[in-house]
């Protein structure tokens, strides 16, 4: 099979990369109605599979789970989760032929096997759903022409999809219809109903394309969302310990620092995050972020180039075929780092202390968010998509580090995200080594001293922060998420 994106001509590639429209709330007036009375069969009962299914059932849909015979016979975790939550569970052969919508929520590397198993069983005119388009775009999976192919991609881990729904809200969501598979022209109606059934319409839905979702998702998770947090954690911890900081305190400052810092980012963008600093610290964080952007821009651009060309995907799929040798090696190496094995700090760190003593971490967040956004937009991805795949998801990933350090982050994210994270972090750590030797007192682990600032310089820095395009689009999109709950509780 050929990479689907690479079969398109340049005009088609640009059109699909640039497809992004914020949908009006009244477009979801029918809610999940289009799927009421129809049979939805979910394949896979992981975090997305279970939690989307619970939401869909609570929205009045008929939901069941198709699992492999071995998973049922051996009563594996997927079978237990589905049955314990009262869902009908059956084999592919038992459930797929009756399904009006088959939703494939298995891991990326399983998609080809799953789709090849379910396609022959699907009835004529049924629909196939994804929450990530890797199988269609990068693998180039060919789907029967009578089947409608749609995507509903919540911009959140599965657990958050459920929690926000239970609060009467939802999470921002991308929806799309595969242009090669919409024989009856009902793809958008199916996608809208599915998105509404998960609660996504209450937080904002972007009509996108499979191509735009995949390319932006890969870029975000590899760079700012996971790769930058991993590289930053390792670099900052080692620097603190090298300068004599208690390893336990250093570990806590970093583990919970990302979460606390990005909570401000979530509520008010880069502007609010920077406003939590004293004026001298803000000027220093800005200067550090500009240095970081200059150093890291080529690395961000390389990742975007490799994602657009398909180089990243082909390399990762080669590792799949080699029993994940690279992935598992990198995972093991991460588990052996000093940060992951540092003792726990039993004392308290106040919320403001995370900001005052984490100026470099704030600079890393600012630089990473802006670079990811700028690089995606330069590649033809629309600003709204770039925002969701950079700034919006960052607090959610930071929250996983707060739970169990980098181990938890890499467990929660997909194998695709984890592989890309290691690629980026393994390049970023040596790239930033020299930069780390030039830090000043007050950049990390100690507060910036003094209060004196130049008014004109502060004015110009404030203007530069607030006039960045990600701040403009972020203010608009956050207006649809006024019900967001507070994730972080400073440790």
From Swiss-Prot:
Cofactor note text: Binds 2 magnesium ions per subunit.
Any one GO molecular-function label of the UniProt entry: magnesium ion binding
Record-annotated KARI N-terminal Rossmann domain positions: 15-208
Pathway: Amino-acid biosynthesis; L-isoleucine biosynthesis; L-isoleucine from 2-oxobutanoate: step 2/4; Amino-acid biosynthesis; L-valine biosynthesis; L-valine from pyruvate: step 2/4
Designated name of the protein: Ketol-acid reductoisomerase (NADP(+))
Chain ranges of the KARI C-terminal knotted domain: 209-344, 345-484
EC assignment: 1.1.1.86
InterPro entries recorded: 6-PGluconate_DH-like_C_sf, 6PGD_dom2, KARI, KARI_C, KARI_N, NAD(P)-bd_dom_sf
Function (record text): Involved in the biosynthesis of branched-chain amino acids (BCAA). Catalyzes an alkyl-migration followed by a ketol-acid reduction of (S)-2-acetolactate (S2AL) to yield (R)-2,3-dihydroxy-isovalerate. In the isomerase reaction, S2AL is rearranged via a Mg-dependent methyl migration to produce 3-hydroxy-3-methyl-2-ketobutyrate (HMKB). In the reductase reaction, this 2-ketoacid undergoes a metal-dependent reduction by NADPH to yield (R)-2,3-dihydroxy-isovalerate.
Residues engaged in binding Mg(2+) 2: 217, 389, 393
Catalytic site positions: 132
The protein's required cofactors: Mg(2+)
Ligand binding (Mg(2+) 1): 217, 221
Annotated positions binding NADP(+): 45-48, 68, 76, 78, 108-110, 158
Catalyzed reactions: (2R)-2,3-dihydroxy-3-methylbutanoate + NADP(+) = (2S)-2-acetolactate + NADPH + H(+); (2R,3R)-2,3-dihydroxy-3-methylpentanoate + NADP(+) = (S)-2-ethyl-2-hydroxy-3-oxobutanoate + NADPH + H(+)
Classification via HAMAP family: IlvC
SUPFAM superfamilies: 6-phosphogluconate dehydrogenase C-terminal domain-like, NAD(P)-binding Rossmann-fold domains
